[in-house]
């Protein structure tokens, strides 16, 4: 069997090649996700051989589709960046921690020993930061002692928090 790093590199190639518009080289945007897509997103990466651990701490998010979509898109971009720029990743941890009026998304990846990080244009990080800013939030990204971390904080008025949608909970 292929080594996990080879599988991840192959998945990266297939994902970017298949998604690219041949005329522009751009990857098209997908339609808005349906219910349960954050958990489904993680499952798709796991099925493709990416070693993802997913956890949720706290209550569900409010039933605000924009907030849910923002969290989903930031997670999607962070995980896709792992495929693009860290194909030898040994482990990925996706954690959502829900507090009063705040959700914190953390995506950590551990690089294989001796791997060299690849650098992108930074446009994905800009997009994540712009999405988070709509919800009074922030996105920080940078190296850790073992790999790379993306941390997004989203905020909302707790008085509007109904917390009725369990879409983002792990399956």
Role assignments for model-derived ranges:
Residues 1-171:
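Glycine-rich ATP/GTP-binding catalytic cores of kinases/NTPases
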